[in-house]
């Protein structure tokens, strides 16, 4: 026996001794939540028995979410270079000729967070520029999301606290005189 359900978008296969159940997935990812290879299942049968189920990749464009750690970046420019390196790796992993629609997500605690946050429009343009430089025909940037965070502030020692309190006291004295 063989059961196939076609409207489930993720390909899944269960093979039991007396029954095969297949969700062949969809032929083409239609949005960023449908990443990776898409296609169909070619089912070979001999009389009343399934002998082989072969996945076929049929999509003409891949959706990808590119998670880029910018934790090592100290500057805006270093973060952009890290994205470029990740785009290059993605491009190398794609089947020959396949284009990709890419959502980039920069994440991690980084010294560059404030610069990235302040220059988000430029960040998007820089990422698009990286994609165009690598392969304008195969990489399309759908969106660039900033999910980074600032580095944790280091705890102040007693001397730093004392200096900070003295500065605050001086500011209060000046404010009282005005």
Feature names for model-found ranges:
Residues 1-73:
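Functional cores that coordinate and move charged inorganic groups
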Residues 56-178:
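Accessory, non-catalytic peripheral segments of nucleic-acid enzymes
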């Amino acid at each position: 026996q063989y059961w196939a359900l076609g409207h489930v978008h993720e390909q899944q296969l269960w093979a039991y001794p007396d029954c095969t159940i297949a969700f062949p997935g969809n032929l083409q990812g239609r949005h960023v939540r449908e990443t990776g290879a898409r296609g169909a299942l070619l089912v070979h049968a001999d009389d009343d028995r399934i002998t082989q189920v072969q996945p076929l990749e049929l999509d003409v464009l891949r959706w990808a979410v590119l998670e880029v750690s910018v934790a090592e970046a100290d500057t805006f420019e270093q973060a952009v270079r890290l994205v470029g390196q990740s785009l290059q790796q993605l491009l190398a992993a794609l089947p020959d000729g396949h284009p990709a629609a890419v959502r980039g997500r920069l994440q991690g605690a980084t010294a560059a967070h404030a610069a990235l946050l302040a220059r988000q429009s430029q960040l998007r343009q820089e990422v698009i520029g990286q994609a165009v430089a690598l392969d304008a025909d195969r990489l399309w940037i759908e969106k660039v999301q900033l999910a980074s965070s600032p580095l944790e502030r280091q705890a102040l020692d007693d001397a730093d606290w004392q200096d900070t309190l003295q500065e605050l006291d001086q500011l209060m004295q000046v404010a009282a005189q005005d």
